[in-house]
Design a protein with these regions (language model features):
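Charged, alpha-helix-forming regions
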Residues: 1-108, 112-211, 218-221
Length: 221
């Protein structure tokens, strides 16, 4: 995996990362499953419920379908927070009028990522005009993963990273689930780490003056 870097000079501005086929497949699958959580139509790589128990990495996603109508689900509240946390009636009314459009926007962003990850070749190419929306979608994915990992504070994140480090085999340089007390949590945490790193590299590209200017101009159109 290589983080996002600016495309070569001479062509349209874009952020380009490199992922191997397995990395692309894992990220695309999570993207699709978060889209399903938001009520989107199947992207094409969603969890086969019959196989979930045999897939340690995605066992944490069990119950996403039932969470669609449950605004109290922690993962849903992370990406679709209540507008009035202290007044359930007001919050529910606000959701009724605003949530469908917001869900649709988030699903569209996820679908754009999913399509890019299913292109041939190792490169994940994000045009400058799509960089901010892609970063926002990555935030949604990371929020869902953080919820499933019970990460609420910086201390929780530090504990997770320490757990991952303990599972690392320093001889081969590979993460070995057998070394962890909770292998599924370690694998999910590794995915969270990878997406965080990718998002940070994308934001480094976004924060360039010309990219920010192009994004503002597009929003003004």
């Amino acid at each position: 995996m290589r983080g996002f870097q600016e495309s070569p000079a001479g062509g349209p501005s874009a952020a380009i990362a490199e992922l191997d086929p397995e990395e692309r497949a894992v990220i695309a699958r999570v993207v699709a499953d978060v889209g399903l959580l938001l009520g989107g139509e199947p992207f094409g790589m969603e969890i086969d419920v019959a196989d979930v128990d045999d897939d340690p990495l995605f066992r944490h996603f069990r119950g996403f379908e039932s969470a669609l109508t449950d605004p109290d689900d922690p993962a849903v509240l992370r990406i679709l927070p209540n507008a009035a946390p202290d007044d359930r009636d007001v919050a529910d009314e606000f959701r009724r009028f605003t949530e469908p459009e917001l869900r649709s926007l988030k699903v569209d962003r996820l679908r754009t990522i999913w399509k890019a990850l299913n292109e041939d070749g190792p490169e994940w190419i994000i045009p400058a005009a799509d960089a901010m929306s892609t970063a926002a979608a990555l935030t949604d994915i990371r929020l869902v993963l953080a919820s499933r990992l019970d990460m609420e504070t910086d201390d929780d994140a530090a504990a997770l990273y320490a757990e991952i480090d303990r599972a690392h085999d320093t001889v081969t340089g590979r993460y070995l689930a057998d070394n962890a007390q909770n292998p599924e949590r370690v694998w999910l945490g590794m995915l969270y780490q990878a997406l965080t790193w990718l998002q940070e590299s994308l934001m480094s590209y976004v924060m360039r003056d010309d990219v920010m200017r192009d994004d503002v101009m597009r929003d003004d159109v």
